Regions:
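N-terminal "arm"/small-domain region of PLP-dependent enzymes with the aminotransferase-like
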Residues: 1-26, 31, 247-249, 375
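Amphipathic, non-transmembrane alpha-helical secondary structure
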Residues: 16, 60, 109-117, 136, ...
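Phosphate-binding glycine-rich loop
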Residues: 26-73, 87-89, 97, 146-150
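PLP-dependent aminotransferase class I/II
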Residues: 34-38, 46-47, 122-126, 131, ...
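PLP-dependent aminotransferase-like
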Residues: 64-168, 175
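Hydrophobic/aromatic ligand-binding patch that stacks against planar heteroaromatic rings
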Residues: 86-88, 180, 260
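Conserved active-site segment immediately N-terminal to the catalytic lysine
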Residues: 152-199, 244-248, 297
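Active-site PLP attachment segment
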Residues: 170, 183-233, 259
Length: 399
């Protein structure tokens, strides 16, 4: 039996939507993208949603909307993918990486509080695996640090504190204390990449909570300008009779979503509650099967939060990195693809060049060295889930 790690769940519904988009004669940003934005905003309970070509672009556009740039500092986790950190570098701000708490995938919140200076302009928490982080703690931290905050644009002044900019790449559909992620932090970015629960092949979106004194429609238009060359009309608006004239308001960027991508998303959204439920069924089976094994797993469903069930993260108790890698190889030999989430950011060459060293992030390294991620996707049959369970137990026992 061969078990893929995370293939997309594409049905005739998605295929038909894409075909209709292709036949429509409009394949770039247009009515389907706008409809997906409306439906996502309704689903999440946010004023607006801006669909873009990736979560990375969404996060960078959020930082730019907030006016963050050279001379500013942005805090995020050392335990994540590069896309949580690289947008900070893109805008020219100083990247401040925080170690995880012991035996946790979340940042050490005491270290977050200690890292805040009068230059801190955003904190980017990461919902690893689809599990919402401790947003209440984060808001307490930024409210306690109000006296240090020096705002530099209208949005910052309206907030009056350090903005929480959530990396929700994994957590589309998750809830924190009854609220959807995307509607908890000040700003949020989501990924719709091919491996995500909800996909548009490539893609992502930005959302925000209403900020008193800030017009949501004007903010939406600012995102549109930033993501389409600074052009004050999109291609669809320019096709209207006599409406060719346009202006370039700034030398900005190109990261819009196309209607072909949005067509996939519209179909996915119709099915999404069922996809989330299937992920929970698989997680429950894994949890039950591994409860007596020498492993630690992430709690996806608690009284406080409901995960999106994106990744099934397993730590092998007391294992070395070499033993973890051996387990990955043995499972691959038996046809089960696994992965590791994540190699901490300071271990990568690009960040070493920026002066980071994994020696300064011992807890993040301890999380990484014995972590393995098992297949978790909605194409898995019950038989395949049973095979993953059997194979994992067998290979774990042989270490």
């Amino acid at each position: 039996m061969k078990i893929n790690f995370s293939p997309p769940d594409i049905t005739e519904l998605e295929i038909n939507e894409v075909v209709e988009a292709l036949k429509s004669g409009w394949i770039t940003t247009g009515p389907r993208t706008k409809e997906l934005e409306r439906r996502i905003a309704t689903y999440l309970g946010t004023p607006k949603a801006v669909c873009l070509n990736s979560a990375t672009a969404a996060l960078e556009m959020i930082l730019r909307v907030l006016g963050i740039g050279p001379g500013d500092e942005v805090i995020t986790s050392a335990y994540s993918y590069t896309a949580s950190a690289s947008p900070v570098v893109h805008v020219g701000a100083k990247l401040v990486l925080i170690d995880t708490a012991p035996d946790s995938y979340e940042m050490d919140y005491d270290k977050v509080a200690a890292a805040i200076t009068d230059k801190t302009k955003a904190i980017i928490p990461v919902d690893i695996g689809g599990v919402p982080c401790d947003y209440d703690r984060l808001f307490t931290i930024v409210n306690d640090a109000k006296s240090l905050f020096i705002p530099s644009n209208d949005i910052q002044r309206a907030l009056g504190r350090i903005p929480i900019v959530a990396d929700c790449a994994h957590s589309f559909g998750a809830t924190y204390k009854g609220m959807h992620t995307g509607n908890v932090a000040d700003f949020s970015s989501f990924s719709f990449h091919a491996v995500k629960n909800f996909t548009t092949a490539e893609g992502g979106c930005a959302t925000w909570n209403h900020i008193e004194g800030i017009d949501d429609e004007a903010l939406y238009k600012e995102f549109q300008l930033l993501s389409l060359h600074g052009q004050d009309k999109d291609a669809l608006a320019k096709t209207k009779m006599g409406a060719w004239e346009y202006d370039i308001k700034g030398t900005y960027y190109k990261c819009n979503m196309t209607d072909i991508m949005a067509a996939i998303g519209l179909a996915q959204l119709e099915r999404y509650l069922g996809l989330l439920e299937r992920r929970r069924e698989i997680i429950d089976r894994y949890n039950d099967a591994f409860k007596d094994c020498p492993v630690s797993v992430v709690p996806h469903y608690t009284d406080e939060h409901m995960s999106s069930g994106h990744l099934y993260l397993v730590r092998i108790n007391d294992a070395t990195a070499e033993q973890r890698n051996e387990l990955i190889e043995r499972m691959a030999e038996k046809g089960v693809a696994t992965n590791v989430h994540y190699k901490p950011i300071p271990m990568h060459t690009a960040y070493k060049k920026l002066g980071f060293s994994i020696d300064d992030y011992p807890n993040a390294y301890d999380q990484f060295k014995n972590e393995i991620t098992l297949p978790l996707h909605t194409n898995l049959t019950d038989e395949e889930v049973s095979y993953v369970i059997h194979t994992f137990k067998e290979c774990l026992g042989a270490l």
